[in-house]
Amino acid sequence: YYIKRGDFDTAWDTFEQGMKTVLTVRDFTQIFDAYAETSENVISLMMEELEDEGDEANDNTDTKDRAQQEAEIDRRMQDFEALMERRPFLVNDVLLRRNQDDVQEWEKRVTLWGDNDEMVIATYKNALETINPRKATANLHQFYIHFAQFYEDGGSLGRTDPSAVERDVAAARQIFER
């Protein structure tokens, strides 16, 4: 509806809201694919319009309008790239919404963050606050062990600063004692 009216910002907001509320991967995939396809179409349409204006260019062409159009295309392309980069996290969000006590999905979330130590730690803490031990899937104990090992190893990058390693070992001991 919003796309046909040309109200793309409202359409994007609707897509985002849909992705944040669905409970099945199938529904998410349909919304995500429609969102991505629409974004691609809008970008290609804007690029074609810019090319057409460039072909018809004469001395009266307003360079400010062209610069604004190019900036809008760049912004939309950045948004599209960010959407593609967020996809694994969004799928993981759907699976965690479905079962917040799924230890394996929390482990996948930790893996998605890779070398971003702050987000890895935040994810571990969020998971441990969220997971109900009585409802947790198998290997909750492994999750605690992996968290402690993360600190023991000095994070994902393996710090070499001795004082930082000592603090991390102390944090690892606290986690093991839980």
Residue ranges and their predicted role:
Residues 1-178:
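Polyampholytic low-complexity alpha-helical segments
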